[in-house]
Amino acid sequence: MNFGLSLIFLVLILKGVQCEVKWVESGGGSVKPGGSLKLSCEASGFTFSNYGMSWVRQTPEKRLEWVASISGGVSYTYYPDSVKGRFTISRDNAKNNLYLQMNSLTSEDTALYYCAR
């Protein structure tokens, strides 16, 4: 029996920010438990490096969960216990890119993933 995870990646702009955001799906839409995926979000229309950025997700039950945050500038990172040690948020200010590396994926990680400012 295949216990693959169905992961869908979306990008959400919060606070009425006027910018274009591209989303990139990486690694396909289905991953086996224990697998890895990297999400990427490219932003424009604001000074990316000045803002903290986050990843959030919406579960199949429609719950919103915070996944990770990274500060602007020095880039401090923050995670809930549910993903700490498995997920890594990072940013490339020169390219206006936000990333989420997800390792050791489980069925609990099945969700819609959103990039947010």
Curated annotation (Swiss-Prot):
Q: Which GO terms describe its cellular component?
A: extracellular region; immunoglobulin complex
What segment(s) does the record annotate as region Framework-3? 86-117
What PROSITE patterns does its record include? IG_LIKE
Stored SUPFAM superfamilies? Immunoglobulin (SSF48726)
Other comment: This sequence belongs to the VH7183 subfamily.
- Region of interest (Framework-2), residue spans: 55-68
Query: What's the protein here called?
Result: Ig heavy chain V region 7-39
Q: Does the keyword Disulfide bond apply?
A: yes
Region annotation Complementarity-determining-2: residue ranges?
69-85
Gene3D superfamilies named among the record's database cross-references: Immunoglobulins (2.60.40.10)
GO MF terms held by the record: antigen binding
PANTHER family per UniProt: IMMUNOGLOBULIN HEAVY CHAIN
Q: Which Pfam families match?
A: V-set (PF07686)
Instruction: Tell me if Ion transport is a UniProt keyword of this record.
Output: no
Q: Which residues form a coiled coil?
A: none
Annotated segments matching region Complementarity-determining-1: 50-54
